[in-house]
């Protein structure tokens, strides 16, 4: 059980501008990257492999294929480094964690789109 003051501070840090998404959805995460003294936005496009809902400590993992290699990146949902999240496609999956997708390639790695 958390202290009421801690809960109040955490509640003020939560972001409300992010869209709702689920595992399997194809999303683009635009995040701020700092290189030296310059800042720019970099896009990471892939599908949501897993989502962890823990209030301020929520996180999600996005997987994409880059030059034939699978790349996974975990983001903190309420991070100030995330500029925006764009949901490209909604998926119809029956699992909460899509770890089995790591071993699939080609046509086997397709996800059914929600109609």
Swiss-Prot record:
Supply the HAMAP family for this chain: Ribosomal_bL19
The reply on keyword Metal-binding is no
List the record's Gene Ontology CC terms alphabetically: cytosolic large ribosomal subunit
The entry sums up its family as follows:
Belongs to the bacterial ribosomal protein bL19 family.
Q: What are the record keywords, sorted?
A: Ribonucleoprotein, Ribosomal protein
Query: GO molecular function, one example?
Result: structural constituent of ribosome
The protein's matches in Pfam families, at most eight in alphabetical order, are given as: Ribosomal_L19
Name the Gene Ontology biological process terms.
Answer: translation
| Known function | This protein is located at the 30S-50S ribosomal subunit interface and may play a role in the structure and function of the aminoacyl-tRNA binding site.
What is the protein's given name? Large ribosomal subunit protein bL19
Q: List the gene name.
A: rplS
Instruction: Specify the superkingdom.
Output: Bacteria
The protein's organism comes out as Francisella tularensis subsp. novicida (strain U112)
The chain's coiled-coil residues are none
Q: Which SUPFAM superfamilies match?
A: Translation proteins SH3-like domain
């Amino acid at each position: 059980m958390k202290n009421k003051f801690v809960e109040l501070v955490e509640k003020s840090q939560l972001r409300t501008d992010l869209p709702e998404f689920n595992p399997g959805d194809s999303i683009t995460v635009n995040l701020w990257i700092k290189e030296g003294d310059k800042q720019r936005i970099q896009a990471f496009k892939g599908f949501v492999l897993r989502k962890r809902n823990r209030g301020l400590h929520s996180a999600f993992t996005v997987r994409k294929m880059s030059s034939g290699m699978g790349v996974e990146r975990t983001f903190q949902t309420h991070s100030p480094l995330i500029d925006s999240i764009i949901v490209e496609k909604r998926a119809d999956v029956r699992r909460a964690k899509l770890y089995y997708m790591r071993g699939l390639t080609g046509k086997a790695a397709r996800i059914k789109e929600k109609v």
